[in-house]
Structures are given as structure tokens and as C-alpha cells.
């Protein structure tokens, strides 16, 4: 495990790289270099100790600020690291601070990290972006924040993340540790716009987009958010070619199905084996599914459409296919104030299937 054992010792360049910040480049620890500690003044001699700290689980100080929901410390860290790669350092589970904030459903933290320049396309060990994770835990406000265009300029110490004196007045005497030596305003706006939109098409290691995840979880509110943001309503998942309509039918989520149809999803779409959403609906006990599809012009299935595809062998054919892999991250809830006031959310208590309510 990576980690810095002693906070009381001066960290040299080797310790800095060993701490997990080596990804910032060999010059990151050199005074005047392009990394996180560029142009350090004597007042910032503490910076390598704080920003170089990593636990045995790979969590940085920024991860810990999110896990413990310590907003003053989070604001302090962001004041010096906004716009740098430090925001996207990953722990041993591949999670960035933004992933953790989404899992915990902390919308204000997501907003601060996003505004500071945290990457929204970074994936954790299951291939999930922060938006995927927000969809899995039904964190609607977090998803809403991530689906907004990023602010024009990452916040830095001269913006909202300022240290304050005892009388609560901003202290602007320090310079941000993080600097962008060669900003390119012409390209930044285009990249920001592309960045948040690309989230909608990002696939996890199961081939699911955030919309697929929201449909599998039968979350109509999240589906509406993604639809309003421009998600592709007809994109098939790669294993069997199921579109969001197919997934809604397989989950017997009539409300989600109605929402997708009203939004313009194609009722004639076919899985790789040839089955239409109506063909799948006729294998389910809920008659509302077929009625909704017929009302929106779904064609009656031919005999060949009724044959079982490689992905389905019963009326609950999605039960085994719509599950995410891997264990969840109970440590991030055990150490947060959330666990003191209410039961841990389901994604942190046990492995989280993509279909929490199998038919």
C-alpha cells in the first residue's frame, strides 16, 4: 500500500512520489516546478506533508475530507489544489474524491469538486464515472450538478476557497499552490462543454451508460434528468443489445417505460436476437407494459421474436445480467457522520446489483 508514514518529517522528492503523487510528474516536488507545489513560499513548507499524505488504502487528504464530510478542510484543500491533477488521484479502489462524494450523495461536495476542476470521466474499478455512481445510489441532486456545464474557470484560492482569519475575513496573503502556467481559454470552453456531455455516453465495465443504470434501478426521476440532459434513449447495451426500453420492460418498471416512450424512445428497436420491447413485454405478467408499447406504435412480434435470446431464458431474464461487479465501500460510511444518524445507504452496506428488485 502506498502511504506516507511520518507527517512530522520533511518529505523529500522520493517520499513525495512514493506517496502516490508521482503521477504529477518528476518535478512535482521541486520548488518552482510545474506541479502542485510550484513556487512554494516559506509559509507553504507544510504543503508536501499535507498533499503528500496517503493512507494505507490509498486515500489522500482530499479523500479523507470527503469521507469525513469535513467541509472547512475540504475548502482549504481546494483553495490550493483547484485546477490540478491532485483532484483526480485515485485510491486503491480507483475512486477519486468526486466518486466518494457521489456515493455519499453529498451534492455540495460534488459541486465544489466539480467547480474546482475534478474530472468527471475518471472511472473507478468497476468502470463507473461519478455520474454512474450517482445513478446507482439515486443521488438526484449530485447528478443534476454533474449534468450542468462546468464553470468557466476552476475555483482557486482567489475565488471562494480562501483561508480566513479569526475575524472571518478572507486572507489573500498566500498564493495558491496550484497554478496553471499556460491556460488556453480558446480550448477550455470547448473541452468543458464536451467533458460534461461525454458523461452521458460513458460505459462502465458492464457496458452500461448512466441511463441504463437509472433504468435498471427503476428511477424515473433520474431517467428524466438524463433525458433532459440529452442522453441517448435508444443506445443498446453491448451484451444482448437491450435498449433502455428493453431494460424497463425486463424490470417491469411501467413508470420508467411510460417516461421513455413519451420522450421518444423507439418501440421498434430489437435486441441482437431480434426481440422487440413488446415481444419481451408479452413474456411478463404485467399487462400494462404491453398496453403502453402498443399505444406508442410498437409492432406486434413475429414468431421469431419470441424465441429466447442468449441473454434470456425466463421471464426474469435480466436478473443475472443487470448486476454490477465487486464489493461496495462500507468504510466511507462507517467513518462519516451519516452512519451516526441513520442506517448506511444500501450501496455501502453490501454489493450493489444494478437490479435491486429482481422480478
Swiss-Prot record:
What the entry lists under Gene3D superfamilies is as follows:
Ankyrin repeat-containing domain
Q: Where in the cell is it found?
A: Cytoplasm; Nucleus
InterPro entries given in the database record: Ankyrin_rpt (IPR002110), Ankyrin_rpt-contain_sf (IPR036770)
What SUPFAM superfamilies does UniProt report for this protein, alphabetically?
Ankyrin repeat
Q: Where is the composition biased (Acidic residues)?
A: 318-331
CC annotations in GO: cytoplasm; nucleus
From the UniProt entry, list the residue stretches annotated as the region Disordered.
153-192, 298-359
Bias class Basic and acidic residues marks the residues at 298-308
Locations of Pro residues compositional bias? 342-359
* Record keywords, A-Z: ANK repeat, Cytoplasm, Nucleus, Phosphoprotein, Repeat
Tell me the GO BP annotations in alphabetical order.
Answer: cellular response to lipopolysaccharide; inflammatory response; regulation of canonical NF-kappaB signal transduction
SMART domains the UniProt entry points to: ANK (SM00248)
Q: Do you know which PROSITE patterns this protein is assigned to?
A: ANK_REP_REGION (PS50297), ANK_REPEAT (PS50088)
Q: Where are the ANK repeats?
A: 57-86, 93-122, 126-155, 206-235, 240-269, 273-302
Quaternary arrangement and interactors, per the entry? Interacts with THRB (via ligand-binding domain). Interacts with RELA and REL. Interacts with COMMD1. Interacts with inhibitor kappa B-interacting Ras-like NKIRAS1 and NKIRAS2.
Q: Which family does it belong to?
A: Belongs to the NF-kappa-B inhibitor family.
Alphabetical list of PANTHER family matching this protein = NF-KAPPA-B INHIBITOR BETA, PTHR47303
This molecule's function is given as: Inhibits NF-kappa-B by complexing with and trapping it in the cytoplasm. However, the unphosphorylated form resynthesized after cell stimulation is able to bind NF-kappa-B allowing its transport to the nucleus and protecting it to further NFKBIA-dependent inactivation. Association with inhibitor kappa B-interacting NKIRAS1 and NKIRAS2 prevent its phosphorylation rendering it more resistant to degradation, explaining its slower degradation.
Tell me the protein's name. Answer: NF-kappa-B inhibitor beta
Species this protein is from: Rattus norvegicus (Rat)
- Which lineage? Eukaryota, Metazoa, Chordata, Craniata, Vertebrata
Amino acid at each position: 500500500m502506498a502511504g506516507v508514514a511520518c507527517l512530522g518529517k520533511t518529505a523529500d522528492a522520493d517520499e513525495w512520489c512514493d506517496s502516490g503523487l508521482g503521477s504529477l510528474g518528476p518535478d512535482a516536488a521541486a520548488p518552482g516546478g510545474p506541479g502542485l507545489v510550484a513556487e512554494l513560499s516559506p509559509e507553504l513548507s507544510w504543503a508536501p506533508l499535507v498533499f503528500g499524505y496517503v493512507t494505507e488504502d490509498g486515500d489522500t487528504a482530499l479523500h479523507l475530507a470527503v469521507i469525513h464530510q469535513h467541509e472547512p478542510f475540504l475548502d482549504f484543500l481546494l483553495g490550493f489544489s483547484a485546477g490540478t491533477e491532485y483532484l483526480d488521484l485515485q485510491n486503491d479502489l480507483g475512486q477519486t474524491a468526486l466518486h466518494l462524494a457521489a456515493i455519499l450523495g453529498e451534492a455540495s461536495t460534488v459541486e465544489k469538486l466539480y467547480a474546482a476542476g475534478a474530472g468527471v470521466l475518471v472511472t473507478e474499478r468497476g468502470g463507473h464515472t461519478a455520474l454512474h455512481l450517482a445513478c446507482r445510489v439515486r443521488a438526484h441532486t449530485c447528478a443534476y450538478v454533474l449534468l450542468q456545464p462546468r464553470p468557466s474557470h476552476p475555483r482557486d484560492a482567489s475565488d471562494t476557497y480562501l483561508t480566513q482569519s479569526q475575524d472571518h475575513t478572507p486572507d489573500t496573503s498566500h498564493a495558491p499552490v496550484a497554478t496553471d502556467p499556460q491556460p488556453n481559454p480558446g480550448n477550455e470552453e470547448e473541452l468543458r462543454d464536451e467533458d460534461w456531455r461525454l458523461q452521458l455516453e460513458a460505459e462502465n465495465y458492464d457496458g452500461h451508460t448512466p441511463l441504463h443504470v437509472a433504468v435498471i434501478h427503476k428511477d424515473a426521476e433520474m431517467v428524466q434528468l438524463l433525458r433532459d440532459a440529452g442522453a441517448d434513449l435508444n443506445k443498446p447495451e453491448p451484451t444482448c443489445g437491450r435498449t433502455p426500453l428493453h431494460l424497463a420492460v425486463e424490470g417491469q418498471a411501467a413508470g420508467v417505460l411510460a417516461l421513455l416512450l413519451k420522450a421518444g424512445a423507439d418501440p421498434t428497436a430489437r435486441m441482437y436476437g431480434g426481440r422487440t420491447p413488446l415481444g419481451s413485454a408479452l413474456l411478463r405478467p404485467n399487462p400494462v407494459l404491453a398496453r403502453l408499447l402498443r399505444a406508442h406504435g410498437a409492432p406486434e412480434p413475429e414468431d421469431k421474436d419470441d424465441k429466447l435470446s442468449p441473454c434470456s431464458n425466463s421471464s426474469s431474464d435480466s436478473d443475472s445480467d443487470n448486476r454490477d461487479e465487486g464489493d461496495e465501500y462500507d468504510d466511507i460510511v462507517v467513518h462519516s457522520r451519516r452512519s451516526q444518524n441513520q442506517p448506511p445507504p444500501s450501496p455501502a452496506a453490501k454489493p450493489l446489483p444494478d437490479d435491486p428488485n429482481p422480478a
